[in-house]
Amino acid sequence: RSLLGRKCRFDLWEPDRFEMNKAMPFEQAVQEYGKTTKLKRAYTYKALNRLIQASAADMTKKAMVDIYQSGRVPLIQIHDEVAISVKDRSDAENISRIMENAVPLEVPNKCDVEVGSCWGNAS
């Protein structure tokens, strides 16, 4: 599950040996490869990546809700970036704190702040 509980499942299995095998649901893999063949979950690297990406998306969405509830309106969100009109740098720093604390984590979450007259001039 992602940080906020979204399910990330890869329920495909393949033999635990180094050769090209077709990944399939567990029951079908047992029938195809036999009961004595050791099976492992297929595509675990994809499952881990999906879990990480889903958690990052959850954190960004939660931060956007918290920003909105603080009285500010996010203009646009792209991947893990949020563009917001602010009065000054201190307002941007407050938004940064909101984003960093949107989801409680054991490892601190850092948020970079860039301010400019337009998105292309932000630094």
Please give the residue ranges for each predicted region.
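Conserved catalytic core of nucleotide polymerization and phosphodiester-bond processing enzymes
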Residues: 1-123
